[in-house]
Amino acid sequence: MSDSKEPRVQQLGLLEEDPTTSGIRLFPRDFQFQQIHGHKSSTGCLGHGALVLQLLSFTLLAGVLVAILVQVSKVPSSLSQEQSEQDAIYQNLTQLKAAVGELSEKSKLQEIYQELTQLKAAVGELPEKSKLQEIYQELTQLKAAVGELPEKSKLQEIYQELTQLKAAVGELPEKSKLQEIYQELTRLKAAVGELPEKSKLQEIYQELTQLKAALGKLPDQSKQQQIYQELTDLKTAFERLCRHCPKDWTFFQGNCYFMSNSQRNWHNSVTACQEVRAQLVVIKSAEEQNFLQLQTSRSNRFSWMGLSDLNQEGTWQWVDGSPLSPSFQRYWNSGEPNNSGNEDCAEFSGSGWNDNRCDVDNYWICKKPTVCFRDE
């Protein structure tokens, strides 16, 4: 028994500590015991590593689940917002439908119908402006022509035309206006019957002016057309007697205008107009200015007028000796007249007037009053 125990004690005595390590180290003699102890230590380390990996996996999984839950929680909020917007749209459509439904009510339609009826009636009472303007022009031309007619046989023809005009006016419905026109025509007829004297012609001129004013107030369109036809016939009768202006001249408000097709300086243009018993144009009214400006701008021609400051610099005067009216200053183009390089004569330029040197060649415009021109 003692022999068997002693070797064990000796084997145990062989164990020694290695002072350089924190664990127990076995020498080669105890190799078998060292191997068993190392196996247990590595097994413990592996167990701890697996536990750490599992914890990391659970953490990641929990993070993913939280993210999914956050996204899912947002869906009901978005759906709720869309639902509220749809409810608001539906409510607006409901109100709009109710408002539209009220538009078709009979009372509303009747109100609209009444408004349209009143508008239609008002429009129906308006005179036909183009016809009245044409009548005005016809009367203006007639007035100018009557002033030059001395022959009694021709005046009898006028008398007949005016008699027909009186009969047509006599059928018009508005009594107060018709009485006024009838009186005017009666005096006109009496004046025409005595025509040869110049004073009588002036009286006819006045009567026609008053008749023109009275005709401008007539509302009945059918009667206006009848009067218009009578005046057309009267115009035709006058045109058989004479022309208002010579060939190649243009008639406007009792005057004849010649727009040249060649060019001369200002002084020679004055002479050219005098040679045809006319005058380099002198403008007397805004209507005449607009008419002439339109003619020159359409043809895109710079044209002389009878205006200059040759007598005194800065004092503009027409060729008939009359001064330039202050109200006509607005017709100068912007910055004109500027007297740049002795510019003493006026021309039509673009949409207004310009001062230019008098020795420049331009087109020119002559003017003279209407007379009776017979065809040879």
From Swiss-Prot:
Designated gene of the protein: CLEC4M
Topological domain (Cytoplasmic) residues are 1-49
Disulphide bridges: C242-C372, C245-C256, C273-C366, C345-C358
Its transmembrane ranges are 50-70
GO-annotated molecular function = calcium-dependent protein binding; D-mannose binding; metal ion binding; pattern recognition receptor activity; virus receptor activity
One Pfam entry name: Lectin_C
| sequence repeat feature ranges | 108-130, 131-153, 154-176, 177-199, 200-222, 223-245
Q: Which InterPro entries match?
A: C-type_lectin-like (IPR001304), C-type_lectin-like/link_sf (IPR016186), C-type_lectin/snaclec_domain (IPR050111), C-type_lectin_CS (IPR018378), CD209-like_CTLD (IPR033989), CTDL_fold (IPR016187)
The UniProt keywords, alphabetically, are: Adaptive immunity, Calcium, Disulfide bond, Endocytosis, Glycoprotein, Immunity, Innate immunity, Lectin, Mannose-binding, Membrane, Metal-binding, Receptor, Repeat, Signal-anchor, Transmembrane, Transmembrane helix
Q: What Gene Ontology terms for biological process does this UniProt record contain?
A: adaptive immune response; endocytosis; immune response; innate immune response; receptor-mediated virion attachment to host cell
Q: Motif Endocytosis signal: list the residue ranges.
A: 14-15
Listed under subunit, the entry gives: Homotetramer.
- Chain sites annotated for binding Ca(2+): E336, N338, S340, E343, N354, D355
Q: Which residues are glycosylated?
A: N92, N338
| Superkingdom, natural source | Eukaryota
**Compartments (UniProt record):** Membrane
| CDD domains named in the record | CLECT_DC-SIGN_like
Q: Name one GO cellular component term.
A: external side of plasma membrane
Described purpose of this protein according to its UniProt entry: Probable pathogen-recognition receptor involved in peripheral immune surveillance in liver. May mediate the endocytosis of pathogens which are subsequently degraded in lysosomal compartments. Probably recognizes in a calcium-dependent manner high mannose N-linked oligosaccharides in a variety of pathogen antigens. Is a receptor for ICAM3, probably by binding to mannose-like carbohydrates.
Extracellular side stretches: 71-376
Membrane topology label: Single-pass type II membrane protein
Q: Segment 6 X approximate tandem repeats: which positions?
A: 108-246
- Which source organism? Gorilla gorilla gorilla
What protein is this chain from? Answer: C-type lectin domain family 4 member M
What positions does the domain C-type lectin occupy? 251-367
